[in-house]
UniProtKB/Swiss-Prot annotation:
The modification Omega-N-methylarginine is found at residue 139. Belongs to the calycin superfamily. Lipocalin family. Keywords: Disulfide bond, Methylation, Retinol-binding, Secreted, Signal, Transport, Vitamin A. This is Retinol-binding protein 4. It is found in: Secreted.
Length: 201
């Protein structure tokens, strides 16, 4: 009889997982996304890392929209090289619009050559423009439509973090992206603020 209960338990676990659709095409994004309201400074509070070398902490992004409505971004943060050399580096991104105003193609590159470069999907999953934003990118799809290599940022307008009610909403969005418990917190300790004493690239 024990094996029967084991099968019942496995079936229950399987049905629980089946309730969440982890295909990238099923993920919802921000309705009627407004680039102009999104522009400005955002501080990365948490990050789900992709494969490759990217900014690791003290990440501050600046989004801007030009007179033609084209969005671009710059980001600065700390990177650790060779396991013991910390430097502050910059990345640049330009965005191409798609039919959905919250979904872009983002071409990005590091000002320093050792950083990753690419042309990824860049989706704004949710934002209230004034407090928080959740960004998502899938770089490689599995055959079943789920994501094999993704990254995601939780941004805040306030470098000191997000209020509790917003944190709860963000956790819900992370679960909807099938990325629950896969984020790490981003430290903001001013490492890249003092340009006179830090390594800059």
């Amino acid at each position: 009889m024990e094996w029967v209960w084991a099968l019942v338990l496995l079936a229950a676990l399987g049905s629980g997982r089946g309730e969440r659709d982890c295909r990238v095409s099923s993920f919802r994004v921000k309705e009627n996304f407004d680039k102009a309201r999104f522009a400005g400074t955002w501080y990365a509070m948490a990050k789900k890392d992709p494969e490759g070398l990217f900014l690791q902490d003290n990440i501050v992004a600046e989004f801007s929209v030009d007179e033609n409505g084209h969005m671009s971004a710059t980001a600065k943060g700390r990177v650790r090289l060779l396991n013991n050399w910390d430097v502050c580096a910059d990345m640049v991104g330009t965005f191409t619009d798609t039919e959905d105003p919250a979904k872009f193609k983002m071409k990005y590159w590091g000002v320093a050559s050792f950083l990753q470069r690419g042309n990824d999907d860049h989706w704004i999953i949710d934002t209230d423009y004034d407090t928080f934003a959740v960004q998502y990118s899938c770089r490689l799809l599995n055959f079943d439509g789920t994501c094999a290599d993704s990254y995601s940022f939780v941004f805040s307008r306030d470098p000191h973090g997000l209020p509790p009610d917003v944190q709860k909403l963000v956790r819900q969005r992370q679960e909807e992206l099938c990325l629950s418990r896969q984020y790490r917190l981003i430290v903001h300790n001013g490492y890249c603020d003092d340009k006179s004493v830090r390594n800059l690239l």
